[in-house]
UniProtKB/Swiss-Prot annotation:
The modification N-acetylserine is found at S2. Residues 1-143 are annotated as: Disordered. Residues 78-94, 122-133 have a biased composition (Pro residues). One of its GO terms (biological process) is heart development. The gene is SMG9. This is Nonsense-mediated mRNA decay factor SMG9. Belongs to the SMG9 family. Self-associates to form homodimers and forms heterodimers with SMG8; these assembly forms may represent SMG1C intermediate forms. Component of the SMG1C complex composed of SMG1, SMG8 and SMG9. Self-associates to form homodimers and forms heterodimers with SMG8; these assembly forms may represent SMG1C intermediate forms. Interacts with DHX34; the interaction is RNA-independent. The keyword Cell inner membrane does not apply. The modification Phosphoserine is found at S2, S4, S7, S32, S53, S451. Involved in nonsense-mediated decay (NMD) of mRNAs containing premature stop codons. Is recruited by release factors to stalled ribosomes together with SMG1 and SMG8 (forming the SMG1C protein kinase complex) and, in the SMG1C complex, is required for the efficient association between SMG1 and SMG8. Plays a role in brain, heart, and eye development. InterPro entries: P-loop_NTPase, SMG9. Keywords: Acetylation, Nonsense-mediated mRNA decay, Phosphoprotein. Residues 36-53 have a biased composition (Basic and acidic residues).
């Protein structure tokens, strides 16, 4: 190579191999200066950069290696080389590649062509660019994490274009029930149709009801679940006793009915316990009894005990409805059902230790006594204290949680009474006649000597309105604690399978079989 830096004709022949063997001066050499070996290495790369332009001058070829060999800091300070102005006067056949290169040069100038080609060149990648991929990776560093975060936030289905119908189906609320369905039929057989309305979530409250015939169990459960007092009783989710059924002395509900609300609260309505109409149906229709029962009344009582023991095992709250105060046989029946109740593990160590050491590993639900069709004198504070005291004495030896979870004093039903008015407050709630609500709304006629102002005032009822009491009862029942029914946390579907096993175990219970033999 000559002193001017131009290559000799024999540069790539025998002379080049001979020059490699010639000893040179020791120490570092300037590879970027004229006469260095970098000049021989860069020449092929320059020929690739001249693919878009055939008329580039020799001076440009000499300056290009100098720009690439300098550090990046000095390269950015150096004025742009005159290679950019030579790009527009390109031949007609190469006009299209030059148009693709123009957007890259408008970003940061000609010197930043390789570094700025990534954001705009990713969609249409250039066909002939073997060297710029290194620059493209460097240019993508500030923008690549943005795309990765977006893909990660949208989940696994984001790149695959999720079906909008599937996405909307996941956001839709669960199917709403319009009426109750059978959980246990009149033949005391388990039904599996209720599982279609259940979900795989654990925040569920199960409320059951017990009571004698004609006390208003179905009406109370309908008002607590989905209906209002203003609606027609024929549209209730739990069908109430019709006037014809009342005249015949029959029962409306048979077996156990199931209903679940949008708030994921399960309501279980049951047939009347110790029902005379069921006993009359068994006797008059010559229905065959199971072989283990000899007498019809024994079979009716065992059916009632099975239902009560089942509710004491699978429910968080059990409401005992009665329409007069009080029937001692009802409390005796509750104690018997507690005795034959299936043994279940304690929900947690804390609850078993706090509820008492005598409970052991047993689970017991909250028990609420609902005095339906209460009269005006039942709301008298003195009568209220007597009812609480009597229930507390009758249930003194019970392990059921019959006190401490519901209070009429705290929900402002008796605003003039102090919170400590009742010495032993049990879970007792009073509900007046629903028919008396419309009768009391009609203003009484003013007498001949009375002021016309009193004719505009409503009549004295001695208690809040029926609708107000229903809303207070609903809020207190729905706010009760929801302890675990078994040693594991149950979802709605798991609760259904658990309840099916409990019902099968209750029907095959040895304790119930032994008790039926004692009755015979």
């Amino acid at each position: 190579m000559s002193e001017s830096g131009h290559s000799q004709p024999g540069l790539y022949g025998i002379e080049r191999r001979r020059r490699w063997k010639e000893p040179g001066p020791g120490g570092p050499q300037n590879l970027s200066g004229p006469g260095g070996r970098e000049r021989d290495y860069i020449a092929p790369w320059e020929r690739e950069r001249r693919d878009g332009s055939e008329e580039t001058s020799t001076a440009v070829m000499q300056k290009t290696p100098i720009i690439l060999s300098k550090p990046p800091a000095e390269r950015s300070k150096q004025p742009p080389p005159p290679a950019a102005p030579a790009a527009p006067p390109a031949p007609a056949p190469l006009e299209k590649p030059i148009v693709l290169m123009k957007p890259r040069e408008e970003g940061k100038g000609p010197a930043a062509t390789t570094s700025t080609s990534t954001p705009e060149g990713t969609a249409p990648p250039p066909p002939a660019a073997p060297v710029p991929p290194k620059g493209e990776k460097e240019g993508q560093r500030p923008t690549q994490p943005v795309y990765q975060i977006q893909n990660r936030g949208m989940g696994t289905a984001a790149p695959a274009a999720m079906d909008p119908v599937v996405g909307q189906a996941k956001l839709l609320p669960p199917e709403r029930m319009k009426h109750s369905i059978k959980l246990v039929d009149d033949q005391m057989n388990w039904c599996d149709s209720a599982i279609e309305y259940l979900l795989d979530q654990t925040d569920v409250l199960v409320v059951g009801v017990l009571g004698l015939q004609g006390t208003g169990k179905s009406m109370v459960m309908s008002l607590l679940s989905a209906n209002t007092p203003e609606e027609d009783q024929r549209a209730y989710v739990f069908r109430a006793q019709s006037a014809e059924m009342k005249e015949r002395g029959g029962n409306q509900t048979s077996g156990i009915d199931f209903f679940i609300t949008q708030e994921r609260i399960v309501f279980l309505d049951t047939q009347p316990i110790l029902s005379p109409s069921i006993l009359d149906h068994l006797i008059n229709n010559d229905r065959k009894l199971p072989p283990e029962y000899n007498l019809p009344h024994t079979y009716v009582e065992m059916q009632s005990l099975q239902i009560a023991a089942f509710l004491f095992t699978v429910c968080h709250v059990v409401i005992v409805v009665q329409d007069w105060f009080t029937d001692l046989s009802l409390y005796r029946f509750l104690q018997t059902a507690e005795m034959v109740k299936p043994s279940t593990p304690s929900p947690s160590h804390e609850s078993s230790s706090s509820s008492g050491s005598e409970e052991g590993a047993e689970y017991y639900p909250h028990l609420v006594f609902l005095q339906n069709k209460a009269r005006r004198e039942d709301f008298c504070p003195r009568k209220l204290r007597q009812m609480h005291l009597m229930i507390d004495q009758l249930m003194a030896h019970s392990h059921l949680r019959y006190k401490g979870t519901l209070s009429m004093l705290q929900c402002n039903v008796f605003p003039g009474l102090p919170p400590d008015f009742l010495d032993s407050e049990v879970n007792l709630f009073l509900m007046p006649f629903m028919d008396s609500e419309t009768e009391s709304e009609t203003p009484p006629r003013a007498g001949p000597g009375s002021s016309p102002l009193f004719s505009l005032l409503p009549g004295y009822r001695g208690h809040p309105s029926f609708q107000s009491l229903v809303s207070k009862l609903r809020s207190q029942v729905m706010s009760m604690a929801r302890p675990q029914l078994s040693h594991t946390i149950l979802t709605e579907k798991n609760w259904f399978h658990y309840a099916a096993r409990i019902w099968d175990g209750v029907k095959k219970s040895s304790a119930l079989a032994e008790y039926s033999r004692l009755l015979a």
